[in-house]
Amino acid sequence: MVKCCSAIGCASRCLPNSKLKGLTFHVFPTDENIKRKWVLAMKRLDVNAAGIWEPKKGDVLCSRHFKKTDFDRSAPNIKLKPGVIPSIFDSPYHLQGKREKLHCRKNFTLKTVPATNYNHHLVGASSCIEEFQSQFIFEHSYSVMDSPKKLKHKLDHVIGELEDTKESLRNVLDREKRFQKSLRKTIRELKDECLISQETANRLDTFCWDCCQESIEQDYIS
């Protein structure tokens, strides 16, 4: 049985001369996480199940949906590098004409009847258009629903960075307070021992405050 590419609108078939044309076919990964990323990248919906399409054993994607850098060509048999994700797919708008033409052609072939009965042809055309419209609506809804998830992920990332910054600032302030307290204690002891005058003690105290403030600003910026 000839294998066909599972991507929407792709007519690539695994034929004996495919490799001569530079076309290779690759089964879906056994790693569930990577396979899930493949499926999401395809943006293919299962109209009958009203959900995301799931690959079956033996389903493949052709090399047209991968970048040149995704392949390992060091061995005689070209293979994909570990963990790569397909990224080259036609958009739904671009596929609209192709998909309608393919579905209609398939339905007309299956429903071919004598030329005297035109009603069957009209039914076939109507069903193929309805099938395409349903598929297009599901694909459009899927792409729209994906946006809030991405926004939520970005929001969580920003909130996490903000919390980390707050925690870092608190640590800096606590450290500088301890340092300032230690310096003032030393200045007070020097003054009590009459090793420095009151004027010098006041200057050192002011200098200590200015240095601490500057240090806090530098730590916060960095």
Swiss-Prot record:
GO terms for cellular component: microtubule cytoskeleton. The keyword Aminoacyl-tRNA synthetase does not apply. Residues 149-194 form a coiled coil. Keywords: Coiled coil, DNA-binding, Metal-binding, Zinc, Zinc-finger. A motif (HCFC1-binding motif (HBM)) lies at residues 139-142. Pfam families: THAP. It comes from the Eukaryota. The keyword Transport does not apply. A zinc finger (THAP-type) spans 1-89. SUPFAM superfamilies: Glucocorticoid receptor-like (DNA-binding domain). One of its GO terms (molecular function) is zinc ion binding. InterPro entries: THAP_Znf (IPR006612), THAP_Znf_sf (IPR038441). This is THAP domain-containing protein 6. It comes from Homo sapiens (Human).
